[in-house]
């Protein structure tokens, strides 16, 4: 399976609680933090929910 590098590029300050929890579930804590995850439908759904806060690259 492909891997995705996800970077939190915008702050979660002032965002709804659901978006904050989604960012936390992806393993991101601070702005400019990154994680590498497996590409699967569950992760894609989370990314789509907060795509305005993230940068996603395929690895």
UniProtKB/Swiss-Prot annotation:
Pfam family of the protein (one): Ribosomal_L30
Keyword Ribosomal protein: yes
GO cellular component, one term: cytosolic large ribosomal subunit
One GO-annotated biological process of the protein: translation
InterPro entries for the chain: Ribo_uL30_ferredoxin-like_sf, Ribosomal_uL30_bac-type, Ribosomal_uL30_ferredoxin-like
Keyword terms of this UniProt record: Ribonucleoprotein, Ribosomal protein
CDD domains tied to this protein: Ribosomal_L30
Alphabetical list of Gene3D superfamilies matching this protein: Ribosomal protein L30, ferredoxin-like fold domain
GO molecular function: structural constituent of ribosome
Entry-linked PANTHER family: LARGE RIBOSOMAL SUBUNIT PROTEIN UL30M, MITOCHONDRIAL RIBOSOMAL PROTEIN L30
Subunit structure: Part of the 50S ribosomal subunit.
Family classification: Belongs to the universal ribosomal protein uL30 family.
Protein name (record): Large ribosomal subunit protein uL30
Organism listed in the record: Staphylococcus haemolyticus (strain JCSC1435)
Lineage summary: Bacteria, Bacillati, Bacillota, Bacilli, Bacillales
């Amino acid at each position: 399976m492909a891997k995705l590098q996800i970077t939190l590029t915008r702050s979660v300050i002032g965002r709804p609680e659901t978006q904050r929890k989604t960012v936390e579930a992806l393993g991101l804590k601070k702005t400019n933090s990154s994680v590498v995850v497996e590409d699967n439908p569950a992760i894609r759904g989370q990314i789509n929910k907060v795509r305005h806060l993230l940068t996603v690259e395929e690895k």
